[in-house]
């Protein structure tokens, strides 16, 4: 059963079109990519990156064009200046996927389980079915402060909702000193 009406899909597409046009007005080229190894390579050489998310790295996770993609912004010279990823899980309980570390390392079992602190109220419903996860966000330091950090994650979520026909969509965050 489709989760979105034709009208809702039209609204998602209108948002995508408007956002892609805004990127173009800023001199950027927007693309949707399916090769997550290219994303991981980009992250390994990106300024201001301290770690590459294993959830979106094919060395650690089962990623295919059917269950994952990344969106990319390139400048006029073709250099990646921003990106973020989406991934689909089909599960009976997403919290169990997170607690078992399969969210991060589903290619190999994790034998040294460190405590994973999940903060969620007791009344949060079980996330099950088609669950989308977004992460691996990066924006080049020279392009920060221009509103792209608002647009790039939102267009990524819109595309994930449309592409994967999701029941749920989430991201994880961590506290930083900023």
Regions from the PLM with identified roles:
Residues 1-119:
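Non-catalytic substrate-recognition and accessory regions of acyl/acetyltransferase enzymes
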Residues 97-178:
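Acyl-donor binding region in acyl/amide transferases
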